[in-house]
């Protein structure tokens, strides 16, 4: 499966359940933009987890990332800030990331131009490599600004899985 394909029921058969589907808070889906991507890579789940969790390296390979910093971190959590710059979008946001080493990173919005942002990365071992899955739901604050920012941010979100797949080949070879 390629990074630009949406999930199908087959994606669920690989055993990658989503904790987002069990959230008690159910935001209005009509206003939310959702991104769901999955790709197989010939690298371990642990290697892919390390790439995604290396927030400080993002400006080195994500062209829209104008800056990143880790505000706090321990074994189970990381608070990080990213600065995005693409077209009319020039904004910083902070997330609290719950870390399940080698398996999952769950993102929750702390502050930024979003009214809502939550999601997760999942890394599942598979024969000859791993499956990398991203689920992201977001909504920008303000109706007019929200439309402009969504138009700029959705392509960024859509390209994330492919960007990390490409980065894995640069870092790990093959």
Q: Residue locations for each model-derived region?
A:
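Short hydrophobic alpha-helical segments enriched in small aliphatic residues
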Residues: 3-5, 26
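Hydrophobic ligand-binding cavity/cleft-lining segments
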Residues: 16-75, 128, 174
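Hydrophobic pocket/interface hotspot
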Residues: 48-49, 58, 80, 132-134, ...
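Hydrophobic-ligand binding "helix-grip"
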Residues: 59-60, 67-75, 83-131, 137-139, ...
């Amino acid at each position: 499966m390629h990074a630009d394909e949406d999930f199908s029921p087959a994606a669920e058969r690989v055993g990658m359940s989503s904790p987002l589907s069990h959230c008690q808070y159910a935001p209005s889906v009509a206003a939310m933009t959702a991104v769901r991507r999955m790709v197989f890579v010939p690298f371990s789940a642990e290697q892919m987890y390390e790439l995604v969790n290396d927030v400080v390296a993002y400006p080195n390979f994500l062209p829209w990332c104008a800056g990143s910093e880790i505000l706090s971190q321990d074994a189970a959590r990381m608070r990080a800030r990213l600065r995005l710059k693409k077209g009319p979008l020039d904004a910083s946001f902070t997330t609290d990331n719950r870390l399940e080493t080698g398996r999952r990173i769950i993102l929750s919005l702390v502050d930024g131009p979003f009214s809502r942002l939550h999601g997760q990365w999942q890394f599942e071992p598979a024969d000859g490599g791993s499956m990398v899955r991203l689920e992201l739901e977001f909504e920008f604050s303000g109706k007019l600004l929200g439309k402009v920012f969504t138009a700029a941010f959705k392509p960024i979100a859509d390209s994330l899985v492919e960007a990390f797949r490409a980065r894995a080949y640069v870092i790990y070879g093959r």
